[in-house]
């Protein structure tokens, strides 16, 4: 569950893709800050209190026992998960194509272990996996009010797959993969990229149909 605390918006207006992008950027910043603090104070006996103070998590500093509330929330989340259709995003053809791409790249790494130390290969693999994860996030919800969120995640998936394309081109320039391997990579990468672009257009059209051009 994503916390929207501290993010101001118009309560009566559905968020569009730009509202969601701003929100996701804020979450990225908070995650980066948390990871930096965790690394800095990893061995400090007062680590949790220090991080809570730095992150502004005042409820954790008040000494309140949140165990029962957390357990209740987990039970609610579990009930919601059981009520939802299983693996809905995994059935989407675009997600399957993105996942198949990551499997193909893994197999290429298995065939040539030296690629694992190549920055261009790491860029290719990392961003292909990231694109797959962003697609999973985009395709997991069918809520009308979350069309903007879906588009925002699709745009992030598009950025990731574009960086993977750059990584593939660099590997060819560096002669770390063959022309034939690059051709297969491009076919798979562009299949995912074009699918993302098509989906963004479809969701934007649905947004305009439901909410107008605002």
Protein language model features and the residues they cover:
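Amphipathic alpha-helical assembly/interaction segments
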Residues: 2-214
């Amino acid at each position: 569950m994503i916390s929207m605390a501290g993010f101001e918006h118009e309560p009566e207006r559905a968020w569009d893709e730009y509202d969601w992008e701003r929100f996701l950027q804020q979450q990225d910043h908070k995650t980066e800050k948390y990871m930096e603090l965790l690394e800095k104070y990893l061995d400090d006996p007062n680590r949790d209190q220090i991080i809570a103070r730095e992150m502004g998590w005042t409820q954790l500093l008040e000494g309140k026992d949140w165990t029962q509330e957390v357990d209740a929330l987990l039970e609610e989340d579990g009930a919601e998960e059981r009520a939802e259709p299983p693996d809905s995003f995994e059935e989407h053809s675009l997600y399957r194509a993105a996942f198949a791409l990551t499997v193909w790249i893994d197999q290429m790494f298995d065939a040539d272990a030296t690629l694992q130390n190549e920055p261009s290969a790491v860029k290719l693999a990392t961003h292909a996996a990231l694109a797959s994860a962003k697609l999973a996030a985009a395709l997991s919800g069918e809520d009308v009010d979350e069309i903007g969120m879906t588009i925002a995640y699709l745009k992030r998936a598009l950025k990731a797959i574009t960086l993977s394309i750059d990584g593939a081109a660099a590997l060819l320039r560096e002669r770390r993969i063959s022309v034939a391997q690059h051709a297969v990579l491009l076919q798979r990468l562009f299949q995912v990229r074009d699918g993302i672009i098509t989906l963004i257009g479809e969701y934007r059209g649905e947004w305009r149909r439901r909410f107008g051009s605002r």
